[in-house]
């Protein structure tokens, strides 16, 4: 039976609507999980939301296959793409629906057809009628209600749903911090507007209120974290201003927020205004639309290639035994491809590496593990690949590449934000920077432990330093759940030592991970418990009991004083 472009386009769009409804249901549950302090459910929902996209793409792709087969009818699909484009003109999630169409098409057909004739390599939404940013926020005018009255209205409207521990104290502290910031920026409370996004941003054990202060000549971002105590009472924890601090909270090493929105593009435009250095890819990912983040990243990369002429080359640092890593010097990312033969004594294979990278993707990254984007069949112009890198490809990842004319296709790769490897950073750092970096390295280990992550290979080369001087882990091939490991104290006599595959002896960790004594001593001065097996076992025990340690994405000195 012949199918019309109209029917085919609507069938794919129906698949997208099913996905988005499920996405919204999982997101809407964030408030109840927060109020119930059901942190286990928080983790499960975050993982399910990431997984569900691929499930719905697969379901829709099978329906398409049943109707049209896997042999491409060029006329039908050219017309289907055109009709689908028309359906999106007034669609509130148009950019996400474009990406969903691409995912379905690419699941069904050969990569030879992955071009702008059949899919949306480039967006066609330039003429799309965007949902106004104002659709996503409420505006308040302190000249009418006064600052305290305005702040009270913000909390009433946003609907957190719980009772506050000491609401009057929270409002007073917010007011004081607001006036402190107003003095710094020379603004007056009666001469401004406050815009607040309608829905709270939920992540881990906190809800965040996000907004901006708009004056005649400027605007200023702010974010208000709200926590919940052991009795289920809410309290405001801080009033955070400055774009760089907000960027850290929305950082690439953190889990995705859950925030309700009918118009993601409007939400992202609001956030982009507050954090102009963030890319669209980063912002879409940060609010849970990670597939849209991939789409935006790929478009950014293609545009960057057209504007530049530098060559892809090996990434700086010690070469790993599992991944071939390369970069484009003018583009702030690294590309990682699993080697054909894993080096050293690695007792696992390719699929284990893939599974572990995906595990981290779904897990709470607590600001200490870089997000990854996974791509298949990525086409790169051969002329942009240096001769040395091409030779390295042929020697290490020959099974993962193919050359088609003037294009090199990588069949699977992972992308991460480029950072300065910690071992290289330390070589050029001054004493103060070394102290801070080794302290933060220890904090990173502890925070990953608290999130039930054992990094496995803790060598300094597997950690990077961000532009905010934060230490972040990025090498996941040996990652395990902390609760799967057995932490033991070393026997006094060597002959008494016996090893099982999951055994770890913390007394040896510092020496193995940080062989240079000058760095190791600084680490152990700040974090001596890292070589105490009892400490690791205590953390393990707490995790098994469902007790999650608080890890705040902002400095402790920004936190409010609680008054009961």
From Swiss-Prot:
GO terms for molecular function: [isocitrate dehydrogenase (NADP+)] kinase activity; AMP binding; ATP binding; phosphoprotein phosphatase activity; protein serine/threonine kinase activity. InterPro entries: AceK_kinase, AceK_regulatory, Isocitrate_DH_AceK. It holds the Pfam family AceK_regulatory. The active site is at 371. The keyword tRNA processing does not apply. Its EC number is 2.7.11.5, 3.1.3.-. GO terms for biological process: glucose metabolic process; glyoxylate cycle; tricarboxylic acid cycle. The keyword Phosphoprotein does not apply. One of its GO terms (cellular component) is cytoplasm. It is found in: Cytoplasm. ATP binds at residues 315-321, 336. Its main location: cytoplasm. NCBIfam families: PRK02946.1. Bifunctional enzyme which can phosphorylate or dephosphorylate isocitrate dehydrogenase (IDH) on a specific serine residue. This is a regulatory mechanism which enables bacteria to bypass the Krebs cycle via the glyoxylate shunt in response to the source of carbon. When bacteria are grown on glucose, IDH is fully active and unphosphorylated, but when grown on acetate or ethanol, the activity of IDH declines drastically concomitant with its phosphorylation. Belongs to the AceK family. This is Isocitrate dehydrogenase kinase/phosphatase. It comes from Idiomarina loihiensis (strain ATCC BAA-735 / DSM 15497 / L2-TR). The gene is aceK.
